[in-house]
Amino acid sequence: FSPNLLQQALLYAILAAMGAFILASILVSLLLEFKITRSAEYDFTLKGGERLFKVGKPIMGGLLVIIVVTAITLLFNCERSYTYVPIGVMGISAFLGAADDLLNIFGKKRRNRTLPMTLTLIRVHKKWYVRLWYILTLPWTIFQRSTSVLGSHPGKGVLVHEKLLLQFLAGAITAWWIYFKLGPQWHTLWIPFDGFVSLSWWIIPLVIFLVMFTANAVNIADGLDGLAGGSLLITFAGLTAISWIEGRAAFTLLNATVMGALIAYTYFNVKPARFQMGDVGTLGLGALLAINVMAINKTILLPVLGFIFYIEAISVILQVFFRRFLGRRLFKMSPLHHHFEFKGWSEERIVMRFWLIHFFFVLIAIWLSMN
């Protein structure tokens, strides 16, 4: 419980908030100038008047947080042996999100070759080298088609199977860093009230899965003004407290920096939002959340610290399962926040109640971290 570390963390948060407030107006102007705005063409989750209200809203507002956090961390957070991989993984994930955002706006719709068509071409195509190419790329085609159950259908943006590959890369880098660079202590899983359980190399697939799942969970929650930003603010505030309690200086400062930047972002993102986070922010910050929790060896707390995000993601998984295998819907619409919209709840009511529930679980996570 170092007072000096807490004082320094608060300074980082203040600097990040001030920097983000200054950058926000510039970013909004640039997004509008280059027409990086929400389009009803692919935002099929919006309904009625809400669709019309949000069309033309700048997206990629998450760049505000990504830029400020990266700049302050690289300039002032001197323990780079602990921060270069989290920032790098955040950057990879944010790049993927930016590509998806931009392709959804400016890209052309792509067509996927079906598996039966590929098999037919292997048999009947006149040129042997084309047949060879189809044979060599058959595993990729099978993987591509198998992800259609997750919604990887032809469109403008980055498709699910493409996202999974890049997210796997981000997860693999994180797993390498935790397993080989942070030391044997991180080969164990901390359990509240009990101690540590050795996972040995099993920690590697666990880390990869959690980085991928958490990034997508945060992405799914970015559906209402203020929901993802405010929930991330609460999460990183709690994570700052846990890092400080644990005496992890580099991560206390990094999490405080994210918290400060999110204060400014959320100010501009609450309804009516000046901009929306976009995939560039949700995927980047979701990956950073996962890696920062695991880097302080509190992996077991990740579903608690990210409670709302995990609930939103699970609601989508359950909806897909019920529709595919039981032939009916579990929710009126997924993710969960849209279910409550269809029940007649206002956007503000949903967001505020989700925030409060999320805050409650973050308090539980802080308490558990001290046991």
Where are these regions (language model features)?
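Final/C-terminal transmembrane alpha-helix of multipass membrane proteins
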Residues: 348-368
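Short, surface-exposed acidic
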Residues: 38-42, 347-352
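Short basic/hydrophobic patches in alpha-helices and adjacent helix-turn junctions
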Residues: 294-295, 320-323, 339-342
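Juxtamembrane non-transmembrane "cap" segments at the membrane-aqueous interface
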Residues: 313-333
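A short, structure-level motif marking secondary-structure boundaries and short turns
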Residues: 11-14, 39, 199, 320-322, ...
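Solvent-exposed interhelical
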Residues: 223-234, 328-351
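"…together with the soluble PPM/PP2C metallo-phosphatase catalytic core" -> "…together
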Residues: 1-276, 280-311
